[in-house]
Structures are given as C-alpha cells and as structure tokens.
Amino acid sequence: MALSSESTAYGTSSLSTDERLSSRSGAQRKWIKWGGFGAGIIAVGLIVLKTSSVSASTSSTVATATSDEGDVTCFQSSFVNNVTNMMAPIKGLKWTLGGEKKTKSFISIDVDTQFQEIIGFGGAFTEAASLQFNRLPKHKQEEVLTLYFDKEQGSAYDFGRVPMGSCDFSVASYNFAETVDDIDLVNFDVNVTHDTETIIPFLKRALERKPDLKLFLAPWSPPAWMKRSSSEYTASMLGSVKPVGLRDDMRASWALYFSKFITAYKKHGISFWGLTPQNEPEFAAPWEACAYTPEYQAEFIGEYLGPVLERDHPGLTLMVYDHNRNNIQHWAKVIYGHPTASKYVHGMAFHWYEDGADRYMDGVEYPEHLNETHYIDPNRFILASESCNCPGVAFGKDAWFRAQRYGHDIMSDLNNHVAGWVDWNLLLDHTGGPNHKNNLCDAPIILTENGDDFQIQPMYYFIQHFSKFIPIGSRRVHVKVAAHFTKPGDPQLYLNYQTSLATCDGSSRQALHKTNDNKMQVTNTPFCLNMVPLSEGQEIRLVECQWTQQTWTFEETTQRIRLDDKCLSLNDKSTMNGVRVTVDKCEADVKPHQQWTFKDEDGTMRSQASTENQCVTAGYSFVQASAFVTPDNHKVLVVMNENTEAAEFQVQVGDAVLDTEVLPGAIQTYVW
C-alpha cells in the first residue's frame, strides 16, 4: 500500500499505518524495546488524518495568542490514543505573581544566566530532495517553501546544507572535474551543469522566500583521480582508503576545486555562508566518502584550503569534523591547537548518529562530548549539521518515536552549547529515496507515490517547536528541571542505553535494585547495568540480565561497587544533572563519586557525591527542557515529556509561577 494521496494541510501530520512497511522495518530493526509500545513498528488502527488542500495563502493552524487569552502563548504537539494534535494552542495560561513555589515538581528559569547565541535551524538541499521538489505541482512547491521558510506559517528555517557533488542521496555519482590528472582544473565545469537541473533551481526558489538563507557546502568525495588506491581498493568516488583517502599530491587541486565550485555558484546568484572540508571523515562509507585523520585534515586546511579560501573567498565560515558526537572533542583539540589550521577554523560541525550502533541509539549518545568541546575553546561555535532517521519511512507509533528522538536530540544539543541544528533531506519520495546505494531514510516531508502531493511527518513539527520560536540571536538561559511523576510510567528502555544521574522524578527509569546474584537491575525490566570495554577504557550500558555474567562486589564499608579493580563512578567526577554513570579505576582513597547507596524506601539508587535529590537513571530523564531569551526580549521555553504518563509541574520565573502539564509523549513551546 502506498502513502495516502490525501491532500496536506498545515498543522497535520501523516500517521497512517502501512502493515507491509511496518513488517519490513520491524525486521530491519533488530533491537529490544521493553515497555508498552512493544518492539519495532506496531501496526495498529490509527486515525488517518484526511484534510483539504491548503494553499500558501491560507492561515496556519499555529495561532497568535491575543491579550485576553492569557500571559503565555503555548503550543503542544501530542499523539494520545492514536490521535495526533499538532501545534495545538493552549489558551488561558496566566502567571501568578508572588505565588507559592512548589519544591517537588517544577521547572525553574533564570533569564539572567545566559549561554550560547543561536545561529539558526535548517535542512539539506540534496539532489534527492531537489528532484522531489521538482516533481510537485507548482502550488504544492509553494506549500513546501511556506512550510520550511515562512516565519508565520512555517518553520522559519535559516540554514541550508548543500552537497558539493554527489552523495548517497543522489541518483548516481558525479563531480565537476572529470578530466583525469587535470591538476589545475582547466576543464572544471564552471557552469556546474548537473546542479543547474536539480539543486540550483530549488535553492533559487528558497532564496526568493528567504533571501538571507545561510548556505554551507560539504563534499562527500573528491573525483576518483584525486584519491588513494591500495591493494584492496581501487580509487573511486565510492568508499575510501583509511586512514586517509586524499592523495598528498592532490591537496592543492582539491583546495582549488572548492574555490571554483563556490565561484560557479556565485555566477548563478547563490552565495555560500560556510563549508566543511569533508562529510564524515572517519567513515569509509559504501557511498561517496574520503577518510581523514584530524591531523591530516588540519594540515590540509592550514597549508591548502585555508589560504585558497582566504585569497578567493574571504569571509566564509569554516567548520571542521562534520561527523558523529563520539570523537568531536578529539578533533577540536587537534585542529584548534594546530599551528597553521587553527586561524582559519570558526567552529565544529557534527552529526547525531552513534558509531556502529543500532539506529534507535541516534541522538541520545555522548552529549557530554559537546560540553567538553565547547570548553576547549568557548569562542568557537558548535553546529549540529546532520540528523536523519533510518531505515525507510516510518508510520504510526514509530513515526512518533522518530519525532521524539529529534526533539530529544535538539534539546540535548542546545543544552550542551550547540548554536544551531540542521536536518538532512528536506523531502524524499514515498520509499525514503532516491538513494543510489539504497540507504533509504525518513524526512519531515514525504511525497506520495504519484508525486502530486506530500505527507508531513511528525518530526517536522518537533523541529518547528524550536525553529519557529527561537530566532537567530537568541540566547539560551539556565533551566533547572525537577519534574516529578505521580505514576512511574513505562520505562521504554533499549539494549545498550547508557545510564545517568538525574533529578529524582518518580519514574520507572529510576527504580534500581541489587539482585541476589550481585547485579544492578532496573526493577521490573529485564535490564541490568553492565560494564563494556572501549578502545580506551570502559563504560556502562544496559544489557539483558540473563546475558551478563558480571557479578559486582558491593563493599559495605566503603559503599563502592566494584568489578575487579574498576569502580562504578561519575564521569569526570561531575554531579551535573544528566552526567553519565561510568566505570573508572578504583581510587586509593575512597571518594564520593565512587560511593553508592540503594534506598529501600523508594527503590532508588543514589550517588554519595550528590548534594541534591538525584537518582541513578537508566537512559535519561523523561522530561527535558530548554529556555531562551530572543533578541526582542521574548522568553521561550520548550519542554518534552517522553514518559507514558503526563508530567505535571510548575514553571517558575523570578517571582512568577505557572502550573501546567505536558501530555504523555508530547512536546510544548511556551512564549511570553
């Protein structure tokens, strides 16, 4: 069964159920999910939203609150009892000045403690996205442009990412310097002919709507003749030799290629704001790829790319890395500290994927690496440059899960000094393509099979809860989240989840106990805390208790929990909310960050280092929040509740309080 061809409307989403696709995706996702939603995509009788076509001139369902509706404008997107309600206004919210402040369930905001400045949100103009845009009738193209770039009726995107040459989301591999060993690029296609048929027309239409759209480019691969071969690999745009794919003698030519590409786009009236030297430099992908080490990329920037850009295109913003969170801090240390590259680099770009893990882990791993990267050089920014849900196009509860993952990822990034967030494909076809290596994925807008209309996925609205209300120049401000649930809810745990220390909230993720065979189990689930080895050190992951033979020693006199010479610890000895629980070598002197207690009265596990009400949490806290002050001094609070129970809490700002709640699995944005 194909995607429904029913017309689209702003304020709706596609949550139709396709049992064939559900079955296929369930088979592809080999993971364990413990909880009420079950495993994989569950094909249930969902309400299929049938709405009339809405032209670009029609008002959005996102209303503007008037003075008699309350002091606070609020919008909520929810999926309860198989019914979606997207960007629904919650009216009548009013502050109580001097009201009694709750101490058990609250979110407090300190607008005077400010952090990074926001530089924007956006998506990618891939060839796949451009081809789908071109398939749509003109009036539907206008709707897409409104949905993404209009401030009043859309998501107010600020950024566009543009592949330099082909990527996996192209129909086939291509580049603009096909002549082998043309080191001076005399035969470079200065018209960038291939892109004039796809990407450039889409960009021009977007720029008509958003003239100040910030575009940044990223290459997936140089032409094959610029790349290294080996005994096991013949140079091609696909794949790469590791650890370095670019030939030493082609670095000057490759740097010149960047300059000529930027110049060619300028001749079409399209200017770039910035670039990265390479997409995912640590991954020798089966599609277009070129591996780099941080040291080699630093040398390429310092000796070749940086000087060429400074000469030909001064003022461009250069970001490095453009890969997963796992190693971002290492790349920042190397390149920021490099004697020639450092002066050309403005910041770091990164992706949401988790190296080598199942895709349900994307967006939840290693947020502390972003925090560490910020403090390596607080004067340089961090940009989330790619996120994408795979495999295929999701429906039903799995589509909502993917939207929640986006919301969680954006929230986690922003709370760890990230200045902006950019999605991957702006739109794709009904299969999640085209992709010439069959790496099919989801997108916020999915075309119907016949290509005359589109469906809006829930993730579109989760992005909009941030992008629409947090303009460029906004500042993140301090938030303390101390929500508390009256019912614990479904733990919704996954194999290999990490474990953290967070404010005690009464949820099922914070119920842990010591078993009779000396394991640490999440109560009423099959999961235990398990030590796993890394290339350097170890960490704690969730595993099914029946599959681990680890038995921990619980030292009554020291309150340490040890396995051989390793003790359960807090990462970096920190008690910051959300800090990871890990393992380190047991210290000679017993320290609080390696001391733990189990509280029988509430079934929780605590750290002796914490001076606040914090509990060991399997995964992460269900309630997350970020707050901002905009350039016109509006305040914005985004709250997401991933529990299966509603979150009731009090918002506290100065001497003003507001009692409110977020529905199960929902996201809200407050503006005042």
What label would you give each PLM region?
Residues 476, 481-619:
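Lectin-like carbohydrate-binding module/patch detector with strong preference for beta-trefoil
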Residues 65-109, 215-217, 256-273, 284-490, ...:
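Substrate-binding and catalytic surfaces of secreted/luminal carbohydrate-active proteins
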Residues 169-173, 223-237, 281-286, 328-330, ...:
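Short acidic/His/Gly/Ser-rich catalytic and metal-binding motifs that mark active-site loops
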Residues 161-168, 219-222, 276-279, 322-325, ...:
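Short, solvent-exposed turn/loop segments enriched in Gly/Ser/Thr/Pro and often Arg
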Residues 1-28:
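Short, low-complexity, Lys/Arg-enriched N-terminal segments of secretory-pathway carbohydrate enzymes
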Residues 53-67:
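Ser/Thr/Pro/Gly-rich low-complexity linker/stalk segments immediately outside membranes or between
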Residues 84-272, 293, 303:
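N-terminal catalytic cores of secreted or lumenal carbohydrate-active enzymes
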Residues 22-56:
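N-terminal signal-anchor transmembrane helix specifying type II single-pass membrane topology
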